[in-house]
């Protein structure tokens, strides 16, 4: 609730278009974790994935010596992975877990981690098209697209993929290509662990 973006969908034309403006930043925002208590597990999972991909698209580009921004992003990614199991548990929601999840998701898109660094929102742009055409939940399109973008752009993103592998997942053994493969696999496994499929075939597509 602290960002400056939005999306407009027009079902008649199968269009889903994003927009943002500095004028859309709120003067203040109120974040109440208890408002998440009535969300079904599917939407909690969607929130985890969306926040993860928001962070990745401001992080997984190329090195620009933005040391603090890199560490901010890596910390958010690790926090989401840490919070996910408890967030997805059945039973009464845990206030501290939801508070940390809400704050982490907020920091993933309020402009902090993207300040002064290159960004790549290709995953979101492709995901928007899948939602507009096939009605797949937004976050679920991202879980399908991000691993494929990581694979397709692995040479252009090699340095940051290796950094991501080491700092987020602790992957330090093997060749560079093996470490990148392992990092992509861990990303897929994380999405799948919260019940979010990573293949179009899960939606009878492709």
Regions found by a protein language model. Give the residues of each.
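A glycine/threonine-rich phosphate-anchoring loop and its flanking beta-alpha core
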Residues: 1-68, 160-163
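Generic detector of intrinsically disordered, low-complexity, polar/charged segments
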Residues: 2-3, 105, 132, 192
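Active-site segments that bind and position negatively charged phosphate/pyrophosphate groups
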Residues: 58-185
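C-terminal hydrophobic structural anchor segments
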Residues: 174-206
């Amino acid at each position: 609730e602290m960002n400056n973006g939005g999306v407009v969908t027009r079902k008649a034309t199968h269009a889903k278009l994003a927009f943002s403006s500095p004028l859309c930043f709120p003067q203040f925002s109120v974040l109440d974790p208890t408002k998440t208590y009535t969300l079904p597990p599917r939407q909690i999972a969607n929130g985890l994935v969306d926040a993860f991909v928001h962070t990745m698209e401001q992080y997984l580009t190329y090195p620009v010596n933005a040391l603090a921004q890199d560490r901010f992003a890596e910390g958010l990614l690790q926090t989401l992975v840490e919070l996910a199991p408890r967030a997805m548990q059945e039973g009464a929601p845990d206030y501290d877990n939801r508070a940390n999840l809400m704050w982490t998701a907020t920091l993933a898109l309020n402009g902090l981690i993207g300040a002064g660094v290159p960004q790549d929102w290709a995953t979101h742009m492709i995901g928007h098209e899948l939602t507009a055409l096939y009605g797949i939940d937004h976050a679920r399109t991202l879980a399908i697209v991000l691993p494929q973008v990581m694979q397709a752009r692995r040479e252009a993103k090699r340095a940051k993929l290796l950094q991501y592998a080491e700092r987020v997942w602790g992957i330090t053994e093997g060749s560079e290509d093996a470490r990148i493969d392992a990092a992509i696999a861990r990303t897929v496994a994380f999405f799948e662990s919260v019940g979010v499929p990573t293949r179009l075939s899960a939606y009878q597509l492709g």
